[in-house]
Amino acid sequence: MLAITPPYGDEAQRAHFERDRISELTRLGVMNADGYVDPSVAQWIRLVCRPARWLELRFVAGRGEMLRGFVARGGAGTVVALRSAALVTFTAMEIDHPEALVPVLTVGLSDQRPARFEEFSLPAHTGAKADERIRNGASVHDMLDYLGIPASARPVVVAAFDRDRSYVEIVAGQHRDGHRVSTDVGVSVVDTTVGRVLVSPTRAFDGQWVSTFAAGHPAAVAAAAVSYTH
């Protein structure tokens, strides 16, 4: 775990600032007595800064608390970086199966069981408009009628707008032809009081994005993450 330290504001403070930071990092084992960064730590940070493929994670709780995550993958393996306020943790992981990625993707959630409801799909732009209208004061129940949500899914949708929910938005990216390229849409996992919901995008034949809402079983989350990143 490392702290994000504000830089010095005056050149006269530089020597004192550097001495204190080196002392702290040496005490933590990040640097050795000769002033060199531990090779493992250096490799983790290099992979996070220059990954071949990655997943960006944004966790949000009902009270507005936020955690950021970054899953970096490359020839050197997989490193997970999590940031909360001014603290960042780096963890090297062996993820050799899609379901092994699920605990990483949902680490900031409340660990709800999969919700039970009839799966349904909506055009992504329609769902975004409904979400905006609800945030601007429209009735959730009126939106359910407008969108034609199945009866079994209505309690889940209502709970998804409750203040007790927590969710993660996942966006994938990769280095391609020398450029960093991120996906246009993301996968979401939402923990509500009635269970976990998976929202995954697919492109329709006309090129429009469609969001599918399904129970958040670990296998489903893993499958969505794999299909989304390939």
Predicted regions located by residue number:
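Short, amphipathic alpha-helical interface elements at domain boundaries
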Residues: 1-26, 30-49
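Surface-exposed beta-loop interaction hotspot
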Residues: 82-145
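Conserved small/polar residues in nucleotide/adenosyl-binding loops
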Residues: 229-230
